[in-house]
């Protein structure tokens, strides 16, 4: 239904087994009635996503930690997000960027809460264990090898200014990721290539099947616990995983690539 400034209402009706029908109404009474109907629908609706500010990140993380349903965990990231790096590495990055000790402690607290929920997903005792899947963008990971530093989206959004990551720190994150892959049997890492013709948006996305989804891009953070959205995202990400060639998701091949990339960064 389209309504033009109290003047006209264009309504389309589609019933199974029949041709779609469109009706243009100019009668002011009918148009006002349609406007009231739409306003009522909006008032009774709720947003699919809730945008939140970086200062509300702790509350959001504590909220998602209250969800305890079993389900696969998907993380689609252009490259590893340093928001969830190990504590020692995160402290090193923040210190080298001149962040105050007070702010460092705040970010370490966020990191601990987020990693605790991730750790719960990695170590679920369900039988069989639900998969924990990282999908990274291959070319983006390779591009970050070329410069001396690059900007961490997640940390920069939280701090409000650019936070830079060095080659050495990037290499350490890749080694930590390879280590996690060897320690968790239900963890999988796969690389999406630009040549795969898989339509995925340029966002960071963490999605816990049947529970919640968090998205992050340059505009900020968004949270959803709408089951329809989460189910759709889970299906898209799982379909993406199935389309990736075996060589880019085989655990041994992936671990070898991560360690080789780390070694290249440290030369």
Which residues does each PLM region occupy?
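Charge-biased C-terminal accessory regions appended to nucleic-acid-, cytoskeletal NTPase
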Residues: 235-267
């Amino acid at each position: 239904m389209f309504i033009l400034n109290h003047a006209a209402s264009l309504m389309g009706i589609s019933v199974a087994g029949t041709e779609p029908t469109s009706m243009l109404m100019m009668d002011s009474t009918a148009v006002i009635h349609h406007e009231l109907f739409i306003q009522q629908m909006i008032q009774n609706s709720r947003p699919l996503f809730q945008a939140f500010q970086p200062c509300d990140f702790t509350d959001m993380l504590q909220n998602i930690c209250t969800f305890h349903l079993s389900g696969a965990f998907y993380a689609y990231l252009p490259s590893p997000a340093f928001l969830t790096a190990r504590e020692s590495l995160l402290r090193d990055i923040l210190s080298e960027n001149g962040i105050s000790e007070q702010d460092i402690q705040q970010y370490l607290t966020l990191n601990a809460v987020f990693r605790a929920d991730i750790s719960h997903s990695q170590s679920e005792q369900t039988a069989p264990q639900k998969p924990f899947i990282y999908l990274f963008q291959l070319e983006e990971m390779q591009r970050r090898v070329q410069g001396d530093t690059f900007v961490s989206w997640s940390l920069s959004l939280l701090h409000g200014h650019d936070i830079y990551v060095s080659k050495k720190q990037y290499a350490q994150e890749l080694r930590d990721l390879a280590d996690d892959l060897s320690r968790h049997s239900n963890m999988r890492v796969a690389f999406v290539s630009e040549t795969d013709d898989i339509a995925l948006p340029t966002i960071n996305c963490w999605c816990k099947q049947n529970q919640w989804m968090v998205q992050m891009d340059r505009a900020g953070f968004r949270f959803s616990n709408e089951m329809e959205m989460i189910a759709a995202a889970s299906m898209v990400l799982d379909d993406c995983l199935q389309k990736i060639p075996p060589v880019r998701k085989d655990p041994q091949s992936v671990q070898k690539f991560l360690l080789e990339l780390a070694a290249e960064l440290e030369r």
